[in-house]
Amino acid sequence: MSRIGKLAIKLGDKTKAVIAGEQVNFEGPKGKLSVKLPGKVKVEIKDGQMTVQREDDSREARSLHGLTRTILANAAKGVSTGFEKKLDIRGVGFRAEVKGKAIHFSLGFSHPVVFNLPEGVTAEVDKAPRNEDSLPTVGLTLRSSDKEALGATAVNIRSLRPPEPYKGKGIKYAEERIRRKEGKTGTT
């Protein structure tokens, strides 16, 4: 039995889950999500708890058991409390501004970079920049009820200007540590 798969998922007071054929629909204060179920897994809802069982002990069913439970737990948490990801934009003149459903970045290129946010993901830029290692840093917070879409959006934003190892300029996750390198030293 999968150690993760056998754990029950507690649904919050304001979270509703309905099994509709091959998918589970979640509804809560932060929005709606639906999760498609793989063929070898069954879901039951009793007394505000959701349990996931596999149909047989094949390798495929065992691998899908814990994965499906985790995806369902993330959906339940997403519609009740939501998810948040913080990024730091570090560099002189590096800025971000949210305009509607797009983020306008100034990242040291000769042109501004416009990033369109996917459906269900919102962004917020910190009001005042702060200094970290003598570089101005602007905070960017992404929020969504869908953990997968939030992670993909954060990866795509980070790839616009990944942090470089010499000065640490670029876009990085707030909790990420950049391994710094020493510059060239001239010999005399």
UniProtKB/Swiss-Prot annotation:
Keywords: Ribonucleoprotein, Ribosomal protein, RNA-binding, rRNA-binding. The gene is rplF. GO terms for cellular component: cytosolic large ribosomal subunit. This protein binds to the 23S rRNA, and is important in its secondary structure. It is located near the subunit interface in the base of the L7/L12 stalk, and near the tRNA binding site of the peptidyltransferase center. Gene3D superfamilies: Ribosomal protein L6, alpha-beta domain. GO terms for biological process: cytoplasmic translation. Part of the 50S ribosomal subunit. HAMAP family: Ribosomal_uL6_B. One of its GO terms (molecular function) is structural constituent of ribosome. Belongs to the universal ribosomal protein uL6 family. This is Large ribosomal subunit protein uL6. SUPFAM superfamilies: Ribosomal protein L6 (SSF56053). Disulfide bonds: none annotated.
